[in-house]
């Protein structure tokens, strides 16, 4: 009986998707893979199905007894995953944004696969990592939540340049304060960090100019970041309970210089300390639409530098930003 239910659920989840020969949606595309599988999604049915997923177990290595979900792959096949709900936000913050749902899972067909997926007001997003390479599923563009692309990361055509740099004036100071016997993760213990994630008014404007829109964009990005950090460093970041207080929607009154990453380092440190409270977060960061990527080295949990990190891109969405 259990096996029959297992197969039925997996088969039903395939029916949320319908392959299409073309996508009848106009508008600018920020994600432009050279090759992709075009799909139509019944988002409402998928949401209803995902809402039945169980919470992630305390032992994150045991992800084999979750909701069975079949996911469309770029080559025309479907792969099965065992899915659980998990929180990328503190429960108090998640209660303020019930439309944002994040999920994690493990591959069934391919046991090397892991998946992170989310559903927000901007649709469905998924990132699959395996020994065969990375696969993404994203809306065709910002004008639709019903048409999607399933594509391999290696086929992604970069639309925007991105520069990442290091603010190194404190690197030597930090290096001198870190013990040579720091314990490194062995991959079996998942370490959680409290994240204070701010944004500029310009970033929020990209997501409709609302706190809920900006939070949705942040959730998609951080879900994918966690997908990488969990598998490679056994680290997870969760947004703090009052994170909404540092999501700014007015570029004229926010505390940030949107196009200057170096300047925003100290601005974000001050903002996170004053609004969130230094003792209430482990790492801080700010999203913008300019300023590139810049951060201090080894600053996590360092009280004077732990919020000095910036990520900015004119189109803060998709793999180029996430």
What is the predicted function of each stretch?
Residues 5-142, 263:
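N-terminal prosegments of processed precursors
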Residues 214, 310-322:
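Short pre-active-site segment immediately N-terminal to the catalytic Zn-binding motif
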Residues 46-53, 83, 117, 149-150, ...:
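Generic hydrophobic, helix-prone segments enriched in Leu/Val/Ile
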Residues 12-31, 144-304:
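Fold-level signature of zinc-dependent metallopeptidase catalytic domains
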Residues 1-3:
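Sec-dependent N-terminal signal peptides
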Residues 124-129, 282-287, 308-313:
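Short, hydrophobic/proline-enriched secondary-structure or compact coil segments at domain edges
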């Amino acid at each position: 009986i259990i096996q029959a239910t297992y197969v039925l659920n997996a088969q039903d989840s395939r029916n949320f998707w319908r392959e299409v020969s073309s996508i009848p949606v106009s508008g600018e595309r920020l994600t432009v893979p050279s090759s992709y599988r075009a799909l139509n999604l019944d988002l409402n049915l998928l949401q209803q199905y995902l809402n039945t997923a169980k919470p992630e177990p305390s032992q994150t290595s045991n992800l084999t007894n979750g909701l069975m979900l079949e996911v469309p792959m770029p080559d025309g096949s479907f792969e099965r995953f065992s899915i659980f709900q998990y929180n990328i936000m503190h429960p108090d913050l998640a209660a303020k944004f019930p439309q944002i749902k994040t999920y994690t899972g493990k591959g069934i067909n391919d046991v090397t696969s892991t998946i992170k997926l989310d559903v927000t007001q901007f649709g469905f997003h998924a990132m699959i990592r395996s020994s065969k390479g990375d696969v993404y599923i994203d809306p065709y563009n910002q004008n639709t939540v019903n048409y999607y692309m399933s594509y391999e990361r290696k086929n992604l055509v970069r639309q925007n340049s991105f520069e990442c740099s290091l603010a190194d004036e404190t690197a030597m100071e930090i290096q001198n304060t870190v013990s040579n016997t720091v314990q490194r993760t062995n991959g079996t213990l998942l370490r959680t960090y409290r994240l204070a994630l701010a944004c500029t008014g310009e970033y929020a404007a990209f997501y409709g100019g609302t706190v809920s829109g900006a939070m949705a964009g942040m959730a998609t990005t951080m879900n994918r970041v966690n997908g990488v950090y969990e598998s490679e460093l056994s680290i997870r970041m969760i947004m703090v309970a009052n994170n909404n207080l540092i999501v700014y929607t007015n570029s004229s009154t926010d505390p940030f210089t949107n196009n200057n990453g170096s300047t925003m380092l100290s601005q974000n440190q001050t903002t996170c300390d004053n609004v969130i409270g230094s003792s209430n977060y482990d790492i801080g960061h700010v999203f913008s639409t300019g300023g590139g990527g810049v951060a201090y080295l080894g600053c996590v949990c360092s009280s004077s530098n732990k919020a000095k990190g910036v990520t900015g891109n004119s189109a803060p969405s998709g793999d180029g930003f996430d």
